[in-house]
């Protein structure tokens, strides 16, 4: 149902810290889009003992664009606000998010981000370096598909190992309880 991450370079939280749960995802992944409402309900049930975050999947340079969009939104402080609209832009509206003008318009329409601010963040060194760091983390965690959940940097759970994406959250709950002890 889950796999232990053997890498010695995986980040491990200290005793007493909240249990860290990361979703490895991609805005381009239809399974991630379909899973997102269930994950949102799961997040709402969590206590202060769980620290949830997202990590965009970067398996190769072709995946950089969507990770760059994610980190641009994060740097601008509109990540949560744009999360669902980005999924919908890609999977429902079928917008070409590779077109910076289309992307700038989306950021402005959905989050009030001015085009100049969007472009400055999108081109920022900090955004590009976060994409590279994400690529390294995905490799360290041994992720080969999305969505995948990482618990405390120690355990990897995917829909494949758990049996389904919904079952993946049940396994995550088990691992969170195990790590909280």
What are these regions (language model features)?
Residues 45-76, 80-107:
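Structural microenvironment flanking redox-active thiols in thiol-disulfide oxidoreductases
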Residues 19-21, 47-50, 81-85, 112-115, ...:
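A short alpha-helix capping/helix-coil boundary motif
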Residues 12-15, 60, 73, 94, ...:
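Short N-terminal micro-motifs specific to bacterial/archaeal maturation
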């Amino acid at each position: 149902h889950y796999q232990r991450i053997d890498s010695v370079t995986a980040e491990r939280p200290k005793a007493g810290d909240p249990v860290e749960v990361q979703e490895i995802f991609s805005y381009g992944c239809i399974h991630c889009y379909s899973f997102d409402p269930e994950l949102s309900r799961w997040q709402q049930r969590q206590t202060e003992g769980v620290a949830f975050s997202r990590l965009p999947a970067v398996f190769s340079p072709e995946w950089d664009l969507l990770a760059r969009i994610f980190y641009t939104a994060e740097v601008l402080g509109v990540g949560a606000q744009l999360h669902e609209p980005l999924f919908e832009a890609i999977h429902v509206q079928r917008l070409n998010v590779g077109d910076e003008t289309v992307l700038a318009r989306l950021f402005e329409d959905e989050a009030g981000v001015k085009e100049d601010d969007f472009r400055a963040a999108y081109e920022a060194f900090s955004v590009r370096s976060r994409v590279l760091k994400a690529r390294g983390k995905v490799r360290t965690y041994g992720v080969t598909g999305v969505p995948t959940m990482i618990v405390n940097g120690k355990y990897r759970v995917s829909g494949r190992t758990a049996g389904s994406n919904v079952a993946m959250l049940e396994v995550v709950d088990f691992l969170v309880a195990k790590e909280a002890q």
